[in-house]
């Protein structure tokens, strides 16, 4: 089921959390105006409060962890503010008739901003300069010797959805050549020379100076970047990941860095979060990391509320909802 019809008043719950820390009175008014007449719109400031009041809820804006799902028997539709849906696709949700919508097309830009920022911090020695502080002036010559220019290099994008396309646009703006792999091969777009099927992934890896992950976490992508994949990459290639850490075998990544096969890694995500202080990734000067912050933007909440309101209107007319997630595929 990929659509929902709201024929009468609905019980709507807005759950605040990491990706929707607050909702203004104006935004609540917009939700009430978009909802069917006489609908109830409530806000739960904590997940505990949401669980305690979810018995009659039909529509949720926010996260849907398993404990909330378990106490919401009337639930019909969830708009989940999450770039990746993997944590909410437990078997019971997948088997249910609940419609799940999300942020497709809304978050790729700021994820790519972080990805490209980390790439620049790595290639232009920005991270090294910040780490060294005043000592950087004494290391200036050594830093200049290893700076990398992006123009003319090839970026291979793995997963050509919203995040992958946004990375590609930024790479093209920096004068890079871009190729991509996706589960569905397609014609060139967003300045990309080719969009190949995933069975050509090794070919993409061998041709790329920078490999950027834009794929969601699914059964097919979990552990995709293992020792064999890293070995297939160009010697000295750079690796960028801002989507899900579990796509990468971190031991294989550490090994590829340790032997010098990889030139560096730019990461916003890790298989274990928080990444333990004694994890080997912290020991490499050619690894730059942020603590899973790429998904943040001051416009993220408002954009999702706008989509939610549009979908409330569509749910009353029977039109197709925006951002529907295929619960079996995971995106």
Regions found by a protein language model. Name each.
Residues 1-101, 226:
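An N-terminal-biased, well-structured beta-alpha scaffold segment characteristic
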Residues 51-54, 68-73, 88-95, 169, ...:
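Short loop/helix-cap segments at secondary-structure boundaries that form the rim of catalytic
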Residues 98-154, 321:
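Phosphate-binding beta-alpha-beta segment of Rossmann-like dinucleotide-binding domains, i.e.
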Residues 160-161:
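Glycine-rich Rossmann-fold phosphate-binding loop(s) that bind the pyrophosphate
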Residues 164-165:
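N-terminal Rossmann-fold NAD(P) dinucleotide-binding loop
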Residues 183-280:
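Rossmann-like adenosine-cofactor binding region
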Residues 236-238, 242-331:
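Rossmann-like dinucleotide-binding domain for NAD(H)/NADP(H)
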């Amino acid at each position: 089921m990929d659509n929902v019809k709201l024929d009468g008043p609905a019980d709507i719950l807005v759950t605040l959390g990491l990706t929707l820390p607050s909702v203004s009175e104006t935004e609540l008014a917009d939700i009430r105006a978009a909802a069917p007449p006489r609908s109830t719109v409530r806000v739960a400031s904590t997940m505990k409060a949401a669980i305690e009041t979810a018995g009659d809820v039909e529509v949720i804006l926010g996260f849907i962890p398993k404990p909330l799902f378990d106490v919401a028997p009337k639930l019909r539709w969830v708009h989940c503010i999450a770039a990746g849906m993997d944590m909410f696709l437990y078997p019971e949700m997948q088997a249910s008739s609940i419609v799940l919508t999300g942020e497709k097309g809304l978050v790729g830009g700021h994820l790519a901003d972080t990805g490209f920022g980390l790439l620049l911090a790595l290639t232009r020695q920005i991270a090294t300069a910040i780490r060294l502080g005043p000592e950087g002036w004494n290391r200036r010559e050594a830093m200049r010797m290893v700076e990398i220019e992006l123009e003319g290099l090839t970026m291979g994008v793995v997963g050509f959805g919203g995040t992958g396309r946004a990375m590609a646009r930024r790479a093209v703006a920096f004068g890079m050549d871009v190729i991509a792999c996706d589960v569905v091969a397609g014609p060139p777009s967003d300045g990309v020379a080719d969009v190949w099927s995933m069975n050509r992934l090794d070919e993409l890896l061998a041709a790329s100076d920078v490999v950027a992950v834009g794929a969601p976490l699914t059964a097919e992508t979990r552990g995709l970047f293992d020792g064999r994949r890293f070995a297939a990459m160009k010697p000295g290639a750079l690796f960028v990941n801002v989507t899900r850490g579990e796509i990468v075998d971190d031991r294989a990544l550490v090994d590829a860095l340790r032997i010098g096969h990889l030139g560096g890694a730019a990461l916003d995500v890790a298989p274990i979060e928080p990444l333990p202080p004694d994890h080997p990734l912290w020991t490499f000067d050619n690894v730059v990391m942020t603590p899973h912050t790429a998904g943040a933007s001051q416009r993220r909440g408002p954009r999702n509320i706008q989509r939610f309101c549009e979908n409330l209107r569509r749910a009353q007319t029977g039109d197709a909802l925006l951002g529907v997630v295929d619960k079996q595929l995971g995106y």
